């Protein structure tokens, strides 16, 4: 840390939209409503997933983790944000800013990896549906979620010190509503291209990773000539396909705009509940191209599905 940052114990000033008090009141009301909806909605999802044994499946296990991430996002951002919008005090302590940056980056990185995991889970559910429950075992799903959280911790552990050690030439005004990495980088008075490139690499790869399986699924259905399946798959893939480019553009935009949109991370995310891709247990409920006689798996389907479902029923009661 440079000598000009020796006064690091001084509080940062979160500028936000403090020059427009009328806008602050509107933002306060809107963000408060979305915070309440986020807290109530995600809490209800988690409780439902825990209490209903029928939802102890891989897809809903990942969904429960995503809901928990949303709750953590809201808890780490909303209190300070609402405090700044609702009162004259616009400051945040140095240590509070570091903690907010670390938690924000950790949760954001974890969510990026988790969305990629959820997308490929849907890929396995469609393309290997007869063996889905055998492939996506509880132990594997728990490992994937653990990897997502570890990636988030690692990325935040690497990037936070690099961001806070940038020379700021005594600047204390953060041109944002919270201590986010692009806003803190914008305060620096030294070259930041390397830090920005490192920041962009982990998040920039997740939108293509999450969107990659869906064009393949649509192309496979088109090649089979199943019009109903193409229409159904398009509806199911649309949330992921819309969310992925939006995430990538948001990463690029944050490096050029000084004041990102207020409460952006507090809005409910699309693509969280791809519930129309549930794995069906009986062949008569499956689309024509997934019938056993066409897959050549008449003998092992019941055994494979039974083992997978028994494994989830016994193993997820303690994890969901």
Curated annotation (Swiss-Prot):
Disulfide bonds join 97-179. It is a multi-pass membrane protein. Gene3D superfamilies: Rhodopsin 7-helix transmembrane proteins. Residues 267-320 are annotated as: Disordered. Keywords: Cell membrane, Disulfide bond, G-protein coupled receptor, Glycoprotein, Membrane, Olfaction, Receptor, Sensory transduction, Transducer, Transmembrane, Transmembrane helix. It is found in: Cell membrane. Belongs to the G-protein coupled receptor 1 family. This is Putative olfactory receptor 2W5 pseudogene. It comes from Homo sapiens. The lineage of its organism: Eukaryota, Metazoa, Chordata, Craniata, Vertebrata. The gene is OR2W5P.
């Amino acid at each position: 840390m440079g000598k000009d940052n020796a006064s690091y114990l001084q509080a940062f000033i979160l500028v936000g939209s403090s020059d427009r008090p009328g806008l602050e009141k509107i933002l306060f009301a809107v963000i408060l409503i979305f915070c309440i909806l986020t807290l109530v909605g995600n809490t209800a999802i988690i409780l439902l997933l825990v209490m209903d044994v029928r939802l102890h499946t891989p897809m809903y296990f990942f969904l429960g983790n995503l809901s928990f991430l949303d709750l953590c996002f809201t808890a780490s951002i909303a209190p300070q944000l609402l405090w700044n919008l609702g009162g004259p005090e616009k400051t945040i302590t140095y240590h509070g800013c570091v903690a907010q940056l670390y938690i924000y980056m950790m949760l954001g990185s974890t969510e990026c990896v988790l969305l990629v995991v959820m997308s490929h889970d849907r890929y396995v559910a469609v393309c290997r549906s007869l063996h889905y429950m055998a492939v996506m075992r509880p132990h594997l799903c728990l490992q994937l979620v653990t990897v997502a959280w570890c990636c988030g911790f690692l990325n935040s552990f690497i990037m936070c010190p690099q961001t806070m050690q940038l020379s700021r030439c005594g600047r204390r005004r953060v041109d944002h509503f919270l201590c986010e990495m692009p806003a803190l980088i914008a305060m620096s008075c030294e070259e930041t291209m390397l830090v920005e490139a490192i920041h962009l690499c982990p998040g920039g790869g997740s939108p293509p990773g999450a969107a990659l399986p869906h064009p393949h699924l649509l192309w496979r259905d088109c090649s089979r000539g199943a019009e109903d399946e193409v229409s159904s798959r398009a509806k199911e893939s649309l949330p992921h396909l819309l969310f992925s480019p939006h995430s990538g553009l948001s990463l690029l935009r944050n490096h050029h705009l000084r004041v990102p949109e207020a409460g952006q991370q507090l809005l409910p995310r699309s693509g969280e509940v791809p519930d129309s891709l549930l794995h069906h247990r009986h062949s008569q409920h499956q689309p024509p191209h997934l019938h056993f006689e066409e897959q050549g798996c008449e003998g092992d389907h019941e055994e494979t599905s039974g083992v997978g479902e028994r494994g989830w029923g016994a193993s997820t009661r303690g994890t969901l």
